[in-house]
Structure formats: structure tokens, C-alpha cells
Amino acid sequence: MQDVIFFLSKHILLISIWIFCFIAAVFFITRTLLSKSKMINNFQAIKLINQDKAIVVDTRSLESFKEGHILNSINVPLKNIFLGKIKEIEIYKMFPIILVLSDTYKVNACIKKFFEYGFNRVYILKNGLYYWKTDNLPLIVNDK
């Protein structure tokens, strides 16, 4: 027991760092488990689309949307979400929503808005369309 006390007294900084890391890990794990939304990868998104009839909401600009988007996705630019202009997707409140975001720093604010609008099952496509493209998954291109 004296050896433990001696070790602790000589290595205060090391012990402090370990305690900080432990608290941070517990915080992030708890936050992830209690979060209402989840970050999903491409294959989880495909499974949600095929099995649960998830609706893909692409929050990128119309120009980016026309350059390539997921089949049957609905374009609702991020600014419209924050302004409350979501008439196109209000009828889908009972379905899971998969968000395609280009501005990852606005994820939390966007999710909060969707929960305020009454959507209960909101998912975020991890890394937006970047990994969708790198996995060679199909994109629809509109030239109009």
C-alpha cells in the first residue's frame, strides 16, 4: 500500500492525465449512447433505405445536388432548414431521415432543427457524399 501511495505522490501529472482521459472517454461514450441521432456509414444507409424506407435529405446547394446525388434524395438546402422551409419533407416525419451534409460543423444545429420540426429518427451519412463516391455507389446527375 505504501508503494502505491509513493507512486501516486511522485507521478501526480501522470495520474492527472489518466484521470482526465478516463473522464473524457466516459463523457464521449455516454454522449454517443444518449444521442438521438446516429452517424451511419454507406452500407447502414443502404440498409435503412431498403428495409425501413428511409428518406435521404441532401442539404447541399442546388448546384452541388445537380452535380450528383443519391437516388430519390430530396434537396433541402441547409439555409432552408434553418429558415423552416421544409414543406417538401414534412410528410416524411414517420420515416427515418438520412442527412447528407457538406458543412460538417453545422451537424448539431441541423439535427436540433429536425428534432424541433418533429422528426424522431435522424441519421447523418458519415462524410457526406465523399465516401459514397469513393465506394463507387451510384449517383444521379441532373444536367437541367
From Swiss-Prot:
Protein name: Uncharacterized protein BU052
Lineage: Bacteria, Pseudomonadati, Pseudomonadota, Gammaproteobacteria, Enterobacterales
InterPro entries assigned: Rhodanese-like_dom, Rhodanese-like_dom_sf
Signal peptide: none
Source organism superkingdom: Bacteria
PROSITE patterns: RHODANESE_3 (PS50206)
A Pfam match: Rhodanese
Cross-referenced SMART domains: RHOD
Domain Rhodanese span(s) in chain numbering: 50-140
